Amino acid sequence: MVALLVSAPLFFTSCNDDNGPSFHYEVVSDGAFIVNSGNMYSSIDGSLTGINYASNVAVQKVFAANNGGQSLGSTPNDGLVYGDKMYVVVDGSNTVEVINKKTMQRIKQIKTTELLGAAEGKSPRHIIAGNGHIFFTTYGGYVAAVDTVNFKLTAKYKVGSYPEGLAGYASSIVVANSDYAKGHGNISIINLGTGEVETRNVEGINNPQKVFINNGNVYILDWVYYEGEYPNSVEKGESAIKYLAGNKATKVTDAYYASMLNGKLYIISNPYGEAKYSVCDLNSNPYQGTTTPLNLSEGVFSPAGIDVDPATGEIFVLSYNQGENGYADYYSNGYVKRYSKNGSYMYRYDTGVGPCAVFFNVGVKTILDN
């Protein structure tokens, strides 16, 4: 069985030796990283903001500061911490940056078009890790498996059109193939044991973006899609969390941004209007969920994402700032607000341009039992 993780193992067993002390492991987090996509159309490169919990300070452009001023690249999109390394997926530069999480210095730059091929490796999008490997999607229609010791390609899997998010469970990876919002998105299931890939058209899935798995149940964040060519395209469908059962998906709840911790989805819906925040508990009712309002003590101007620290349960909401025209400013720095697990406002931190993802500096601490 292959256990696939987003950042770090979350469950451990206590250890006891008849001749020695008893101890257990605890997941801890000492900071967060904000992936800032920049603005490709204005030639603003992306960056990484580091938040240190101990000092409560957000440091901008931490990658550039520790790598001789070198840019992170064009349109970074996702990242994670796995072991003693950090991995950042940089879409527009066709790279995955491998970074020492303590020194923030580059260990390796994986050039995805060289690793997979010019077409196959184009535009890496999202990443997960486990079992000594990272797995990332590319708009070339592939998932790559890369060894985290020698950074060599272990396997590549042909999936659907324009894959986005992915999630692992047991010996499988489920991939959301967006079809670039054209309405014909589908799901791929990779069997890591056999190397076989099943790409499945699913009734009710149009533009899938993320995959969540809880107790073996699969949920898809599916967005609206567009018919026709821009600027005359017409918006169709709805953005929602959907429960996957065979070749059919049924709506669980409205959602545009979502993150999951311990079987609970933390959700933002209608981000371009009057944003709504909620929590959908999938544990007691896996098919429909139990959705309740997430009462944040204060909101943000223009939500751009949500995530939850797996060690503390604290909630992070990304946002654009308000521009002079009264609308979201996509060309200047954004911000992130940090809340307690109950939704009480704690802190606000500035970010770079276009904050788009959060990941956490999670590790494991050994605790002696009394």
Give the positions of each predicted feature.
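C-terminal motif of bacterial Sec signal peptides marking the signal peptidase cleavage site
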Residues: L10-S14
